[in-house]
């Protein structure tokens, strides 16, 4: 009888190991000391933090907002661009990073279509520029440019990364963390505009702001969510970020921050009739494949502008992705001994390919989202996190009003918490050496106040090399 029990126990252990090995066969979940449950929670956290892009992206690209007949098409293109890009991250790069049309870049595309560049570019023209920028980014990621110290071939893009000073690379995660937190504070109306000082803390003493749905109510929703996340994280509760977002969403209902009209289909451009959105998208008249059909018929005399815009799109996408990947991967400890993210080349190929796919579908540059840090902070370490995000974006196309119902103030609590977690990387910066501390500080502060990861990196590198050349020149002995 004892032998029978032993065989049953051993058999159970064997089956358990077999089952675990199957679940790990592709994503290597146990290798990174994670679990399927953790990865699912992480994917949900990332999605909830970035779901706002579904409505914000069409509004940024189309100046007419929901009144523009192309709004539904751009919404579908936004979701599909996010799905394709994030699936590439899941299956090619196998990293817990999510992609979607990037903020800032979509506003640039909107200004191009709106005529702000001095030429009247069509929607197809703008998508063609984005498409070519994606091709340039892809070429930079695959063209070989020498070998590293291990004899492995490296790409031109990797050479650019290797040429980045260490002080700047160490500053990127800190800057991105503060940048994410700053976005969260703004989305929550905790930080508001001021015509004299540009920014200020929301005035909690102003009774007008306490009206139902007012700025103080939004701030309270985010602060409440942050407190919930912090307390649950202190006790190592899995899914603390998601619970915090959902709890603050519930609080937002009586405070009037959440718009209940969204759920009943009373908001223009947001409907439960998903087939109407798909019909508009697949008609082909609004966005899809316009980059090919009408994209390369540029206005006369706009060649130089087109070249500059294309290079700008490619460089912003590349440096934004580099910065986001370094920040998120360093926070998740998914970096090699040289401080580079694991599967770095595949991450870049995934990003550039997603940009090309997005342009063909009719949306602006698809890039790796800093909100991926929300999933990383929830424990996401593998491509399964990205897969969950992609699935949720797929579902969102059919349940758009439900996801649009989550107020930005509720998601802001997660962004602020991510900023707290990424701030710990500041201890890696050598502040004893001014040659490192000054460029590091400029990188961080310019990234936040300049509202651009790329500008922060660029300013930091510029200051570093100016100081480097100046100090070398000053330290040279005078020859007689």
Regions found by a protein language model. Name each.
Residues 83-91, 112, 138, 227-231, ...:
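Alpha-helical transmembrane segments of multipass membrane proteins
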Residues 62-70, 112-124, 146-169, 178-230, ...:
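Inter-helical loop and helix-membrane interface segments of multi-pass membrane transporters/permeases
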Residues 103-105, 130-135, 172, 219-227, ...:
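Hydrophobic mid-bilayer segments of alpha-helices in multi-pass membrane transport proteins
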Residues 68-80, 123-132, 208-220, 404-414, ...:
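Structural signature of hydrophobic alpha-helical transmembrane segments
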Residues 16-74, 245, 249-344:
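Helix-loop-helix hairpins and the membrane-proximal interhelical loops
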Residues 213-214, 227-282, 314-318, 446-459, ...:
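Flexible hinge motifs at transmembrane-helix junctions and intramembrane kinks/re-entrant loops
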Residues 1-5, 473-480:
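Short, small-residue-biased leader/transition segments that mark boundaries at the very start
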Residues 22-53, 57, 81-82, 102-111, ...:
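Helix-loop-helix junctions within the multi-pass membrane cores of secondary transporters/permeases
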């Amino acid at each position: 009888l004892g032998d029978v029990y032993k065989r049953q126990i051993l058999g159970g252990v064997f089956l358990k190991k077999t089952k675990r090995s199957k679940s790990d066969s592709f994503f290597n979940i146990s290798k990174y000391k994670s679990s399927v449950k953790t990865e699912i929670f992480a994917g949900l956290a990332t999605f909830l933090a970035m779901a706002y892009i579904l409505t914000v992206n069409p509004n940024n690209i189309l100046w007419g907002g929901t009144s523009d007949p192309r709004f539904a098409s751009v919404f579908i293109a936004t979701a599909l661009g996010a799905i394709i890009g994030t699936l590439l991250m899941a299956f090619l790069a196998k990293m817990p990073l999510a992609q979607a049309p990037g903020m800032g870049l979509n506003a640039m595309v909107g200004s191009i279509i709106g005529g702000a560049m001095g030429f009247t570019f069509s929607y197809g023209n703008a998508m063609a520029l984005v498409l070519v920028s994606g091709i340039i980014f892809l070429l930079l990621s695959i063209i070989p440019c020498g070998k590293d110290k291990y004899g492995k071939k490296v790409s031109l893009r990797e050479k650019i990364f290797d040429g980045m000073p260490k002080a700047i690379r160490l500053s990127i995660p800190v800057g991105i963390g503060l940048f994410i937190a700053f976005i969260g504070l703004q989305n929550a109306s905790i930080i508001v505009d001021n015509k004299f000082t540009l920014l200020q803390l929301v005035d909690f003493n102003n009774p007008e702001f306490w009206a139902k749905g007012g700025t103080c109510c939004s701030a309270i929703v985010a602060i409440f969510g942050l407190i919930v996340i912090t307390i649950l994280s202190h006790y190592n509760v899995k899914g603390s970020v998601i619970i915090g977002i959902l709890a603050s969403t519930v609080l937002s209902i009586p405070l009037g921050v959440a718009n209940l009209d969204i759920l009943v289909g009373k908001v223009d451009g947001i409907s439960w009739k998903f087939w109407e959105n798909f019909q508009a998208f697949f008609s082909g008249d609004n966005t899809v494949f316009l980059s090919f059909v009408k994209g390369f018929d540029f206005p006369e005399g706009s060649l130089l502008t087109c070249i500059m815009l294309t290079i700008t799109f490619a460089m912003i996408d590349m440096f934004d992705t580099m910065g986001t990947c370094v920040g998120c991967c360093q926070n998740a400890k998914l970096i090699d001994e040289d401080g580079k993210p694991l599967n770095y080349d595949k991450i870049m190929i995934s990003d550039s390919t997603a940009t090309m796919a997005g342009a063909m579908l009719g949306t602006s540059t698809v890039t790796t989202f800093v909100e991926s840090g929300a999933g990383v902070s929830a424990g996401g370490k593998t491509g399964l996190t990205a897969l969950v995000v992609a699935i949720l974006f797929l579902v969102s196309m059919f349940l758009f009003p439900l996801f649009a119902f989550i107020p930005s103030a509720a998601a802001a609590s997660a962004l602020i918490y991510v900023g707290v977690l990424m701030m710990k990387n500041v201890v890696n910066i050598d502040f004893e050496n001014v040659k490192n501390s000054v460029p590091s500080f400029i990188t961080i502060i310019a990234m936040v106040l300049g509202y651009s990861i790329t500008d922060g990196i660029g300013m930091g590198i510029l200051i570093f090399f100016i100081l480097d050349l100046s100090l070398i020149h000053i330290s040279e002995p005078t020859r007689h």
